[in-house]
Amino acid sequence: MAENFVVVDGGVVAPKGFKSNGHKDRKYGAALIYSETDAVAAGVFTTNKVFAHPVALSKDVLVNNNVFRAIVANSGNANCFTKGGMEDAELLVKKAAELLKIPENQVLSASTGVIGRKMPMDIITLEVERAFENMDLENSNENASKAIMTTDAFPKTVAVEFEVKDKKIRIGGIAKGAGMIAPNMLHATMLGFITTDIEISKEDLTNSLQKATDESFNNAVVDGDMSTNDTVYVLANAQSGVKYTDCKDEFDEALTYVSKELAKMIVSDGEGAKKLIEATVYGAETKEDAKKASMSIVRSLLLKTAFFGADPNWGRIAAAVGYSGAEMDMANFDIIIGDISSEKQAILVKAGEQIADCGTPELKLAEEIMKEDKIKIIVDLKMGSFENTAFGCDLGYEYVKINSEYTT
């Protein structure tokens, strides 16, 4: 399907009526995203039964309010499983509301960092003040993205634009995440903040975000660990003058694209990762089976290490699909490895028959492809018509180093 939008600069400030900025001083940082007019909001959160105080606070605020103006986020501390954590979460929101001169119940919040450590609120609130001071800077979007980074190697930002009846609608986003990525967010350590200037109801925005999340963040795996803080927010302020009811398909497609791009940036930045892996499963009996099989591939530690070493051990792909729980017939399925950036493909298994073996050109080509930094795995189960794409990365020595020293 042809894309009905174009990529533009600006991230969360690309849509009309939004400002942002961030500030980080070594370990701790804070970011603000602000709508100059009233907006509706939607959010999805971690399903981890151990969840952070800002998750609990913002869930409640979203349920009980219909008007929102801002998002405030801090990095360096997760504000999870600590004494006085809810009071600290409320203080973070209060500081943002005071600076922006808006009610506290119009502010959504998020935190990321070390779990089980008391929030240094004197430092965090100072970072919020510093972020607020320069919300009109030309590079304010990148500042906000950098401010929420922890073990991230680079800021993650994207924006798109499409037209309806000669009016432009924009969607922009920033995200952070590199490790502890295996979200399962319903109704995403990984944070995603998205803005749009479309006019949309809270119910429709929530439904659109849930659909986009299922196709993007919930298909992303770095290490298989689900964070206590995973969160994605969308603010929509209606400044484009275009109603969602006039462009449902176009908006949902664009929102899913933004979400997928942010999810792919996150897995590309997996702690120590060098390669993006896209696993697409076709021909599944159900959508659930397609997701089970594709997620099983990108979760497999054996496969992650194989991609790190460019080892074309395709048997690990077959095994991952086989134990995923998806219906399959081992006598009739395909496995292909390809380079995302080109048309190179190596057929490893065809209709259940081994094609690639020691000394064959297919195995040699697979090894060459696995040296690239963007690799796709294609599996056709030949059981039905459903498909799913999951996103993952390789796993190397640097991941162990980063996580063995995280709190020291």
Swiss-Prot record:
Keywords: Acyltransferase, Amino-acid biosynthesis, Arginine biosynthesis, Autocatalytic cleavage, Cytoplasm, Transferase. The record marks 188-189 as: Cleavage. It holds the Pfam family ArgJ. SUPFAM superfamilies: DmpA/ArgJ-like. Its main location: cytoplasm. Its EC number is 2.3.1.35. Catalyzes the transfer of the acetyl group from N(2)-acetylornithine to glutamate, forming N-acetylglutamate and L-ornithine. This is Glutamate N-acetyltransferase. It comes from Methanococcus maripaludis (strain C5 / ATCC BAA-1333). The lineage of its organism: Archaea, Methanobacteriati, Methanobacteriota, Methanomada group, Methanococci. The gene is argJ.
